[in-house]
Design a protein with these regions (language model features):
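N-terminal amphipathic/basic-hydrophobic helices that include classical n-h-c signal peptides
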Residues: 1-25
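Nucleotidyltransferase catalytic core that binds NTPs
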Residues: 19-185
Length: 185
């Protein structure tokens, strides 16, 4: 799916097709930040749904100081690129610093996050409030995770893969392959 930079989309207004161009209004840009260690189908689901709400999505690999990573930033970036190759307009970047600073640098109005079970709520609430305190102009938008992905996470998938568990359908094929290589299977 591509979005031309001049013609953004065609929509129906009062039954007539209207062409909306970039210059007609400000692009609604969202950053979808995360560790993506590695990207899972749960993340892809949020990205695909977010892309229906925003004109521009930037998937940003950021550093969470509380985590130890299995994949390097370069590996995570390559896996994201491969997994999102049918969406060439979705940007993928890495950033080392404050998320809200990055959002400002990218002219993004929103931070997109997926919300899984109730257990996510406290952490996400804390992070959203802190980000708002740091910059009131950047809004956090939550999408409810698809039911299929409600109990998945990168860690649980890595653990299953490490012990030879079948993770088909939970991660994009490139990630499945890379996990097999990492764990020597
Ligand atoms: N489906 C399935 N799993 C999902 C998911 C979905 N839709 N959305 C998130 N997850 C999982 C991830 O796989 C991840 O699992 P893991 O903990 O087992 O790795 C977990 O939910 C949350 O990870 P993620 O969304 O990648 O966030 P994070 O906590 O790793 O990273 C940052 C949070 C990077 C966005 C945050 O630390 C940050 O903003 N860092 C920059 C510094 C900064 O600005 N800090 C101040 C913020 S207050």
């Amino acid at each position: 799916m591509t979005r031309s930079s001049s013609v953004l989309k065609r929509e129906l207004f009062a039954g007539n097709e209207v062409t909306i161009r970039n210059a007609d209004f400000m692009l609604r840009t969202a950053i979808y930040p995360g560790s993506f260690d590695p990207v899972t189908n749960g993340h892809i689901d949020i990205i695909e749904r977010g892309f229906k709400l925003f004109d521009r999505i930037i998937v940003a690999i950021l550093h969470n100081p509380a985590k130890k990573y299995l994949f390097s930033v370069d590996e995570r970036m390559t896996l994201l690129r491969e997994s999102l190759k049918k969406y060439p307009d979705i940007e993928i970047e890495a950033f080392d610093g404050l998320l809200v600073d990055y959002a400002v640098q990218k002219n993004a109005q929103a931070i997109l996050r997926g919300m899984r079970a109730v257990s996510d709520f406290e952490y996400e609430f804390q992070m959203a409030l802190m980000n708002r305190r740091l910059n009131r102009n950047v809004q956090t938008v939550f999408l409810m995770t698809g039911l299929r992905w409600i109990f998945t996470s990168s860690s649980i998938i890595k653990e299953a893969a490490c012990f030879g568990g079948n993770i088909n359908g939970m991660v994009p094929p490139a990630v499945n392959q890379k996990l097999k290589e990492k764990f020597g299977r």
